[in-house]
Amino acid sequence: MAVGLCVQVLCSLGGWLSLYTSFCCLNKHRSCEWSCRLVTFTHGVLSIGLSAYIGFIDGPWPFTHPGSPNTPLQVHVLCLTLGYFIFDLGWCIYFQSEGPLMLAHHTLSILGIIMALALGESGTEVNAVLFGSEITNPLLQMRWFLRETGHYHSFTGDVVDFLFVALFTGVRIGVGAHLLFCEMVSPTPKWFVKVGGVAMYAVSWCFMVSIWRFAWKKSIKKYHAWRSRRNEERQLRHNGHLKTH
């Protein structure tokens, strides 16, 4: 069983490395980070779809059955995701592109998935955490691509930022709090699984503080720009440069 899991994880790691290499070859005029973020975007979309199917259709429901035995589909998805996180953590360390908080998030994710696979249980809630963690990932990558291509300061950029902040706050913090509560009050999950859940939620709050600061600064900047435009229009009208009909 352990050998089979290791083979799945190694195949997943090889697949993500191959995809990254392919993106690098197809985008030779772009940076390595461009290709890595394409891989991250691909994993985000794929993991959202798979984890949503597991949570909402295949089951079991994470809010009522935390600590339940892993299903075969959960195991496959966790192995697929574990390979990705190993790839991305290695890439971030090699290129020194991320700070301690993101490295801590990746490390906790890797340890949490390994723990669920080794125990043969708690894949239900780990899959739910995967869904909550990745649901904002495509938006985060879109934001980076918009900035790189010079289209961030536009209506599209504002929509992406709004959806990112709204989803992060509502799903990762709001729904995440309810999931953590269900995990803590349930007698089924192991105590160290609960500790891991608390650690992941604490990391989410650290991200949330930074995101709220960003959202506040951007809102103030937008407000001041709007006020400035209105004052200019009023001044022009007052000076008679704008015709009124």
Curated annotation (Swiss-Prot):
Chain ranges of the TLC domain: 29-204
Spans through the membrane: 1-21, 38-58, 75-95, 99-119, 162-182, 191-211
Keywords: Membrane, Transmembrane, Transmembrane helix
Main location class: membrane
A Pfam family recorded for this sequence: TRAM_LAG1_CLN8
An example Gene Ontology CC term for this record: membrane
Subcellular location: Membrane
Membrane topology: Multi-pass membrane protein
PANTHER family reported for this sequence: TLC DOMAIN-CONTAINING PROTEIN 5 (PTHR31898:SF1), TRANSMEMBRANE PROTEIN 136 (PTHR31898)
Similarity comment text for this entry: Belongs to the TLCD5 family.
Name the UniProt record assigns to this protein: TLC domain-containing protein 5
Organism: Mus musculus
Encoding gene, per UniProt annotation: Tlcd5
